[in-house]
Amino acid sequence: MTKALFINGSPRKNGNTAQLLKRAMDGAREAGAEVELVNLYDRSLNYKGCMSCFACKIKGGKKGVCSFKDDLQPILQKAVEADVLVCGSPNYCGYPSAALRAFMERMEFPAVNYSDYSKPVVLKRICSATIYTMNCPNEEVYRQMNYPILMDTAAQQLGVFGPTEILCSYDTYQFPNYDRYDAATFDATHKAEVRDTQFPKDMEKAYKLGKRLVEQCKEDNSFEDAGQ
């Protein structure tokens, strides 16, 4: 069975990012995948980014997956063995969350081949995507803020494992009660309108994304099995 792993890089287990990931899971499940969600900010997880131990570069050592022993290592093992991988994160000051960046460091660096950069050390082909949520109002402002350089670059590095794509949800509803916070920049009425009109469309995009990735993975596997 196709295995699809979903990584929530938001501290909130039911926030905008998590909701989109769960909807993508619905699509993947509908397409026949076995799905699993990991919350990186779960208090039971104790880990950091790359520790520069270079264990993944030792001659004759284990290749293609981070072997540093901590709570993230088993999750990384699942990630490199998955058929589909979908990561999600809020935009924090123009970057993915620190938790997701640490995950990406640990997943992607073992794939870097210091003997031949053109031949990454990849254990299997993975169809992947990254879902971003943010206050940024639209794609035009997203580009004006140079977010493609800061955020898309991080997401596109997953392309070393196979085809990858990015889904952005703009102008998201951030607070349950805007009156409680110093946030005069935002129009609470407008935010609520976007939540009620645009966010459901983004949820549908996430559903189709999850389904599409699983279907793409199955097509790729069928092509390989046919020896073509």
Q: Which residues are covered by each model-predicted region?
A:
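Cofactor-binding loop segments of dinucleotide-utilizing enzymes, especially the Rossmann-like FAD-
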Residues: 9, 40, 131-133, 169
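Short aromatic-enriched loop/helix-cap "lid" or pocket-rim segments at secondary-structure transitions
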Residues: 47-51, 142-143, 176-181
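Short acidic/polar capping segments at secondary-structure boundaries
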Residues: 92, 133-137, 172-173
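Short, glycine-/small-residue-rich phosphate/pyrophosphate-handling segment
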Residues: 98, 112-167
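The feature marks non-catalytic terminal segments
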Residues: 160, 179-188
